[in-house]
Amino acid sequence: MRTIVHLSDLHFGAINEHAIGALIEAVGALRPDVVAVSGDLTQRARAREFTRARAFLGELPSPQIVVPGNHDVPFHNVVARFCFQLSRYRRYITPDLEPFLMVGDDLAIAGLNTARSWTFKGGRVNEEQVTRVCERLSAAPADAARIVVAHHPFDLPPGVGDRLLVGRAHLAMALFARSRTDVFLTGHLHASRISQTGKRYRIPGHSALVLQAGTATSSRERLEANAFNVLRIDRSQAVIEHFVWSSTGMAGAGAFKTLGQERFARDDDGWRAE
């Protein structure tokens, strides 16, 4: 099985400084095949924030696949927001907004940019970019696990309004179903959750896993402490572990500890919990 560490919503510029070292140590100990970061590397897209984010990524194992989030688009500078929306992200993190990795012949993982200058908080995709991502995934070997990394969610917890769903989600999911996408790794909500697309989209023969990661390092915690996910996957099964920051209360010391795991097996319609 391949191991993917999924981090999201780092928010350099407003971080829990005590968690940084422990996170680097925890991720390194897991010896992942891929580290995926699903956006919001910075708080306000400032150069100094991107500099710290770049240094942090340099402390993590490779290969990595990273996509931007809405906080990586300038907020207060209107000219930069609309004319140079991701220029700093491209300069400090990666020029590729839709990266793609093939790990061996059994894991295809694609990045999808959902950040837009005109939506401020929300995200959106278009048919052209989703088609491009799907073509890459479809070209992978038949038995490869197919994963998409995006900042904005393709599914939501009960009671959360659909306005937080990525724009054109239903159009995108129809295309992802054709490319047999297995898993979505997303962020934005600062809350960890596992769900399946079949309950929302109801596409016959397709139900992908949606792994929502909390914020790995932000001091702006909402529903949980700093957290990240670990996905172990092959074509027939998936195992997800959820790691949460636990402070000892001694000068901010602490560690990321696992809260157990959930297991899923594949059948003809997608994934089922074991």
Q: Where are the language model's segments positioned?
A:
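Extended active-site neighborhood of metal-dependent phosphoesterases/phosphodiesterases
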Residues: 51-132, 140, 175, 203-206, ...
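Short acidic, glycine-rich surface-loop motifs adjacent to enzyme active sites
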Residues: 142-157
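N-terminal active-site segment of His-dependent metallophosphoesterases
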Residues: 1-59, 75-76, 97, 132
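Charged helix-capping and loop-helix junction motifs
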Residues: 21, 49-53, 126-131, 162-172
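Active-site neighborhood of phospho(di)ester-bond hydrolases with catalytic His/Asp-centered motifs
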Residues: 7-8, 34-40, 64-70, 113, ...
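A short C-terminal boundary segment appended to hydrolase-like catalytic domains
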Residues: 232-274
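Active-site environment of divalent metal-dependent phosphoester hydrolases
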Residues: 13-15, 43-48, 70-81, 116-121, ...
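Conserved beta-sheet core of the metallophosphoesterase superfamily
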Residues: 162-236
